[in-house]
Amino acid sequence: MKCCDNIDARMVDETSINLDPIQVGGRLTPEAMKAMISWGDGYSVCDNCRKPFRLDYIEKPPLKDFHVDVAEWLGMAQARTVPGARRGFQQVAGTYVEKGDPVLIGALAHYTSYLSVELQKGIVREIPKTADNHITAEDTANRIEDVVREFGIAPKLLYIDHVDYQFGNMHDVKGIAKVAHQYDIPVLYNGVYTVGIMPVNGKDLGVDFIIGSGHKSMAAPAPSGILAATEERANEVFRTTQMEGDLTGRKFGIKEVGILGCSLMGAPIVGLLASFPTVKARVEHFDEELANSKIVVEALRFIEGTKILSEYPRKHTLTRVDTTGSFDQVAQTHKKRGFFLSSALGKKGITGIIPGATKVWKFNTYGMTKKQAEYVADTYLEIAETNGLTIN
């Protein structure tokens, strides 16, 4: 089936249970799909843009209210939309980091955190992970002292993931922020796997910035994201232009420097807006998501030789698993080699696991029903048993 002459229709979630770690939280709501059709044209949301000519002042569609509501929902003073979380990192780093400045980043952080510092010619120093793959307040304090000794100043910024992308482990953001603020270091909370998935309140956590991903965790089209700030930091990170043309004398009103005036137009922002009521509601049911995740995790644990590498009991639906001692043993002699697992899952209508991966891999159960979770769990057990693995 084709969307048009040379593009196939994508029907992954319509035909399969999707376990892809980066896709499940970004699946669009029906409301977002309809809104995209109506507002998908490039500058459609600018139909009613009037003075002061800024995205977060537009009332039809209600973008002005949306920006206010998102900030309140996150326990922050102000919020802006950005074209993906990485642009939020870039905006914050661009505000505080200059050439040669040290910045602390948790050792499990996404590469875009590092690149946002590199773009400013800053210097990254990592907070080490513990033996059980956590970033702690104690290690943060030690690394801050290391930086002070090395550079003569405290880090200009600290990045911390609430839930990291490698293990899906939850880290002590509140404790880390408390330590950082003793040195007056602003704290950037990376919520790409939490904002839109589970309750997040920046005031309770004590962070200066919250960054969320619309297309990863807020049921929105790509690229989309949220950058929220405290009242103290908002005037810095959302600073307005002071530029004036030397020949023309041109000025540019209250356009914001960090996002080059306006950030999201058309499909990404209306999709984000349209899904927001559903997203606000669904975070209150994260306990149900964890219960469904547990069904799959426990089934995998029953397969002899399988290890859950993420913290256990699980606190998030993203899980890293090591099947070197189970499914990879099958792959050594199977005619399809490592591809036997994804092939067997595919025949059962389950997708999202990297084809060929039978050693260490990740999955995310977010958005599943209990019935689907039970089906996935039973399927893994069936594949294991069919291929001669022991079920405990």
Swiss-Prot record:
Subunit description: Homodimer. Interacts with SepRS.
Keyword DNA-binding recorded: no
Entries under PANTHER family matching the protein: CYSTEINE DESULFURASE, O-PHOSPHO-L-SERYL-TRNA:CYS-TRNA SYNTHASE
Keywords carried by this UniProt record: Protein biosynthesis, Pyridoxal phosphate, Transferase
Cofactor: pyridoxal 5'-phosphate
Listed HAMAP family: Sep_Cys_tRNA_synth
Enzyme Commission numbers on file: 2.5.1.73
Entry's family note: Belongs to the SepCysS family.
Binding of pyridoxal 5'-phosphate, residues: A85, R86, N190, S213, G214, H215
Keyword Thylakoid found: no
UniProt organism field: Methanocorpusculum labreanum (strain ATCC 43576 / DSM 4855 / Z)
Taxonomic lineage: Archaea, Methanobacteriati, Methanobacteriota, Stenosarchaea group, Methanomicrobia
Recorded superkingdom: Archaea
InterPro entries per the UniProt record, alphabetical: Aminotrans_V_dom, PyrdxlP-dep_Trfase, PyrdxlP-dep_Trfase_major, PyrdxlP-dep_Trfase_small, Sep_Cys-tRNA_synth_arc
A Gene Ontology BP annotation from the UniProt entry: translation
Reactions accelerated catalytically: O-phospho-L-seryl-tRNA(Cys) + hydrogen sulfide + H(+) = L-cysteinyl-tRNA(Cys) + phosphate
Gene Ontology terms, MF aspect: Sep-tRNA:Cys-tRNA synthase activity
Protein known as: O-phospho-L-seryl-tRNA:Cys-tRNA synthase 1
Residues found modified as N6-(pyridoxal phosphate)lysine: K216
Known function: Converts O-phospho-L-seryl-tRNA(Cys) (Sep-tRNA(Cys)) to L-cysteinyl-tRNA(Cys) (Cys-tRNA(Cys)).
